[in-house]
């Protein structure tokens, strides 16, 4: 058992009764194109704002999302690591709003961040680093690491902050439920196409059996970017980046946030994104 705890990067008992944690509401309403306008505080919220009426945020196709990204890189000269840092910070901020450390049973709260091989995985690494600064205890599973300086640097940053990396992911959902209070899905983003291959097919199968909440970055992994996937993982929190993708219309979880407050006004106008007005200095906006 001690060897298993060392593998998982946690000094926590596996056996025994399950600790109380945030409940996931079943039967949440299906997401719809979000309307924003005059803002009001959400009842019972923590200072979040919600749109009341006026104009719909645009949900992007895969082609549109790729075109927006390319303009950010080429026309506006944003770098990949710059956008990754802003996106990852947005994700950690949304998570802290929905699952503040004081609402979870452990101190510090334990979070498993699962990162894929592309930019979505990079967002997850940045998110994990900021979660550590926000008072959480993140652990990272990163099975397919690209041999690129950007990703190597992100890993080093996490290691220097004493964020553990798993050599193996627990193969049983019940074990993850016992050890972690939240799972961050940073496996695949909007550029993913084709069939899910190993080891990610098995990972998604395990995630499908969890009872702890899942927070998905931009796209729930395994979903078609435009059509969604009713049989895939069903996150409790979806954090759309830049603008929601069409599959977000199939999201049935409790919380949908928009993150990535970096879109130039001219680019927003060109693609008719109709983004909501972020309040004050916030880097996230609650859509649902």
UniProtKB/Swiss-Prot annotation:
The note describing how and how many cofactors are bound reads:
Binds 1 potassium ion per subunit.
The reply to whether Transcription figures as a keyword in the UniProt entry is no
Coiled-coil residue windows: none
* N6-succinyllysine PTM sites in chain numbering: 144
The residues listed in the UniProt record as binding K(+), with positions renumbered to this chain, are 120, 185, 221
Primary localization class, coarse: mitochondrion
* Cellular component aspect of the GO annotation: extracellular space; mitochondrion
Which residue range or ranges hold the YjeF N-terminal domain?
65-275
Q: Name one Pfam family in it.
A: YjeF_N
Cellular location(s): Mitochondrion; Secreted
Kindly give the PANTHER family that the UniProt entry links to this protein: NAD(P)H-HYDRATE EPIMERASE
Cross-referenced HAMAP family, in alphabetical order? NADHX_epimerase
Name the job this protein performs: Catalyzes the epimerization of the S- and R-forms of NAD(P)HX, a damaged form of NAD(P)H that is a result of enzymatic or heat-dependent hydration. This is a prerequisite for the S-specific NAD(P)H-hydrate dehydratase to allow the repair of both epimers of NAD(P)HX. Accelerates cholesterol efflux from endothelial cells to high-density lipoprotein (HDL) and thereby regulates angiogenesis.
The protein depicted here goes by the name NAD(P)H-hydrate epimerase
Q: Which gene encodes it?
A: NAXE
